[in-house]
Amino acid sequence: MRTRYLLWALLALAITSCQGGKTAAGDGDGGDTVKMKYAQLLTIVKHGGEYAEHDGEYAEVTIANPWKEGTLLHRYILVPKGEEGNKTVARLAMQRSAGARCVTDTVRTPVENSAVFTSPHCQLLYELGCGQAIRGVCDLDYINIQDVKKRAASAGNHGSSSAIADCGSSMAPDIERIIALKPEAILVSPFENSGGYGKLDKLHIPIIEAADYMESSPLGRAEWMKFYGMLFGKDKNISTTVAGKALTTVAGKASEATLPASCELKADSLFAKIEKEYLKLKAEAGKLPKGLSILTERKTGNVWYVPGGQSTIGILLKDANARYIFSDDKHSGSLPMSPEQILAKGSQVDVWAFKYFGGAPLSQVQLLQEYDGYKALAAFSRGNIYQVDTSTVPYFELTSFHPELLLREFIILAHGSRFGKLKFYKK
């Protein structure tokens, strides 16, 4: 065990960005590229095994930098654990030292001990049957997953092998707790111009930069589950358990169940189901007349953040056949607007939908106390205000990788209840 960690620590080198282009870590076999139908930032190439004559399988994963065209955000080499994997790691290390163009993080799979900084990825791992691999989280108060909270509460019980450590804030994580966890990988959400990860970079632990939220296509983001399935995937003959019990989760609730042993296979089948349902809903909405106009979010300080026209939310509104005042915008992230800009362009919006955290839904009186300008919105005066409490409703946990759920929600807001009842938003 000690030897394995020493080998891994020597080879796992951090990377913040590098030039784009073909891999420098490959061994010349060309590999087999996993076809991505929607994800534009993610490339996966499988090497070895059936793809070449030599022994030793591994996968190469590259993530394009969403903020700097033509460069890579990160590159990973996923190598199975075991003796054959050790040989593959050594061989690849020699090739990289012989002139690699880009430093690469080596990750031994399956990852069985990880620190996960975001609640949507925690939820996804549970859904893939890999929740047992979560051993540390950040921003625990904002995670709406029952089993995570239960396992975090048992962290003081040293006899609990399934406990989850509270690693503090994702913006300033508790480094000592992370070191004590000895995670095999740390999954974080990257930001533009973040300047790196500070002390985390010095731990020589692979940092998985989950840039899926920067995909412009909702299905593109969901397709990243194929990558996460490979990271946490298990041998088809290995069972998935926590303290002797298999776990699954629906809407944040954990229960005993029989789970597929391979997170990778589960990810492939789950994405296929999500894609089918999403495209079905999109086609049905496209047959309807143009729907109501929808404005999202509310003022934060002096800024009103709204989805860019090419963001996942912007595309969801388009696919719902709703009208969106920033549909012509070309940004894939959020747009920081002044309240005056929003009111000038969106005063006549039909529906106002936003999220809040904790407490009762905000009344119109409370909203006006927050910002008197809200009264200029037609949706406000007509009472077409829809809210979702993310402290009790697993909105982020469920919708991030299940865009079909949010698409249905927006279709109902834009076209009425013919598509069923709202699951998240309440009037």
Report the location of each language-model feature:
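Positively charged n-region of N-terminal signal peptides that target proteins for export
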Residues: 1-5
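General helical structural elements
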Residues: 6-8, 249
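Bacterial N-terminal signal peptides
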Residues: 8-16
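N-terminal ligand-binding lobe of clamshell/alpha-beta domains
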Residues: 18-427
